[in-house]
């Protein structure tokens, strides 16, 4: 099993972790609400976990353009 992190805005792969490197408890998933967990985490048939996050480029774009938070997506 591996954890794969992808940007929720542009889809770029941010990184991956092998499950043997870290326990899922240390990732803080238990602190998410059920709605957040459903929106951010998906479990694949092969046992991998895909997590939606935000990449540095998209975070910088949001920091420079706060009104982008109003949109479901700001990538065109």
Swiss-Prot record:
Keyword Metal-binding annotated: yes
Induction or repression: Induced at 2 hours after sporulation onset as part of the sigma-F regulon, followed by further induction after 3 hours as part of the sigma-G regulon; its concentration rises throughout sporulation (at protein level).
Keywords assigned by UniProt, alphabetized: Cytoplasm, Metal-binding, Sporulation, Transcription, Transcription regulation, Zinc
GO MF annotation list: metal ion binding
Main location: cytoplasm
The keyword Cytoplasm belongs to this UniProt entry's keyword annotation: yes
Chain location of the short sequence motif YXXY per the record: 68-71
Localisation per UniProt entry: Cytoplasm
One BP annotation, GO: regulation of gene expression
Cofactor requirement: Zn(2+)
Pfam families membership: Fin (PF10955)
Coiled coil: none
Residues noted as binding Zn(2+) in the record, renumbered to the chain: 7, 10, 55, 58
Disruption phenotype annotation: Cells missing this gene prolong the activity of sigma-F factor and do not fully induce the activity of sigma-G factor; sporulation efficiency is reduced 50-fold with most spores arresting in the engulfment stage (III). About 10-fold increased sensitivity to DNA damaging agents, 60% reduced chromosomal DNA transformation; plasmid transformation is unaffected. Partially suppresses DNA damaging agent sensitivity of recU deletions. Partially suppresses DNA damaging agent sensitivity of recU deletions.
Origin superkingdom: Bacteria
Gene Ontology, cellular component aspect: cytoplasm
Signal peptide extent: none
Function of the molecule: An anti-sigma factor for sporulation specific sigma-F factor, by antagonizing sigma-F it allows the switch to sigma-G factor and progression to the late sporulation development stages. Might stabilize or process Holliday junction intermediates, although this may be due to polar effects on the downstream mfd gene.
Protein name: Anti-sigma-F factor Fin
Natural source organism: Bacillus subtilis (strain 168)
Gene symbol of the encoding locus: fin
């Amino acid at each position: 099993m591996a954890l794969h992190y992808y940007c929720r805005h542009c889809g770029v792969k941010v990184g991956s972790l092998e499950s043997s490197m870290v326990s899922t408890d240390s990732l803080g998933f238990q602190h998410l609400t059920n709605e957040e967990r459903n929106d951010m985490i998906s479990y694949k048939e092969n046992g991998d976990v895909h997590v939606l996050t935000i990449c540095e480029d998209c975070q910088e774009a949001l920091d420079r353009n706060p009104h982008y938070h109003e949109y479901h997506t700001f990538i065109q």
